[in-house]
Amino acid sequence: MSLAVVRDLRVARAPVTAQDLAALQTDVLAGFVLARAAAGLSDGTIASDVLHLEQVRAWFGRPLWDMEPPDADAYFGKVLRDTAKGTRLSRAQALKTYFLFLELRHKAGIHQMTGRIVECPIDEMNRPRGRQQAKLRIPPTAAQVGRLFAGWREELATCRKFAPAARNYTACRLLSEVGLRVNEACKLDLPDIKWELGRFGKLHVRHGQGARGSGPRERMVPLINNAGQTLRWFVEDVWGQFGDDHTRPGVPLLPSERKNADGTASRIGDETLRSALAKAAGTHLPDWPDVVTPHVLRHFCASQLYLGGMDLIAIQATLGHAWIATTMQYVHVPGTHIEDAWIAGQQRAAARLKGLPR
């Protein structure tokens, strides 16, 4: 039996033009974006991955499929050595996902054109370690948030455009009262308010944030913590000034001044609420050192509900968290909370022992 010569698959074939390589890179990246969109990822997540890939490509200077483990060693060990851990982890994950896509979809085509075998340059030896922790957000105190909304409410009497200002005020009040995410609030429709449900009425959050590709998660949020009064005032006294038909299907709860092509009110964007809240906080909370964002108000809501006696399971359901460990990161207690809990425990123990024979 004769032996056949085995050709090394890593040897490049006939060279291709730069235009061919550029076209292949464009097609592959477009396919990557489309595949991630088909998997249900948000536009922001896909754009973030593409940005990471473009930055690696700009440093490497060649198609990404030419990267080898020594190249990844140099990039993550030297170029990104002093960058934030979250940046290194996100960039490494984007690169691993991209190479997984190349191996599944384009391994044969890339080898046929360039002679290279696609292999991920990130392995167990150079993979950035650690996990990305959420940024700690300490909310203002209840007195400070009360002062913020009290001053904001007084501005409504003298503002130039009452309806948009009252809408922004109402939306931010909702974030602080029942812990809605800003995107969830923007996507609410007027019929999502279910006045007849429960003791206080409920809010049908149809576009809750999902996790691990689950898609939007719906939930019912009770209008506790004065949220029902806030919404009732807005719907009865403010909403009609935007000139939309309340019987129209899909009419937004928080309409914009801008109109759609058919003359109906469009939906407000989250940047409008972010800028309005930042402006109000800068005016009425000048002593607060950090930026007050909608997510900070969400942390404030969780902390106040916990201090008011609501258990963590109920807060988890209100905020729409998949894991109670996430809810625990949202609860910020005062510095004397441990001492107060110890004293309360001693008082309960003394009450149980009272009356027993000595």
Where are these regions (language model features)?
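Short, basic (Lys/Arg/His-rich) helix/loop patches that form interaction surfaces
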Residues: 157-160, 274-317
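Basic, Lys/Arg- and aromatic-enriched nucleic-acid-binding interface segment
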Residues: 147-182, 248
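Catalytic-site neighborhood detector that most strongly recognizes the C-terminal catalytic loop/helix
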Residues: 319, 323-344
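Active-site/catalytic core of tyrosine-dependent DNA strand-transfer enzymes
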Residues: 224-288
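N-terminal core-binding DNA-recognition domain of tyrosine recombinases/integrases
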Residues: 30-135, 155-160
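C-terminal secondary-structure termini that scaffold catalytic or DNA-interacting sites
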Residues: 1-19, 345-358
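Conserved tyrosine-mediated DNA breakage-rejoining catalytic core shared by Y-recombinases
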Residues: 187-231, 237-240, 332
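Flexible interdomain linker/hinge and immediately adjacent N-terminus
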Residues: 7-14, 77, 108-152, 209-212, ...
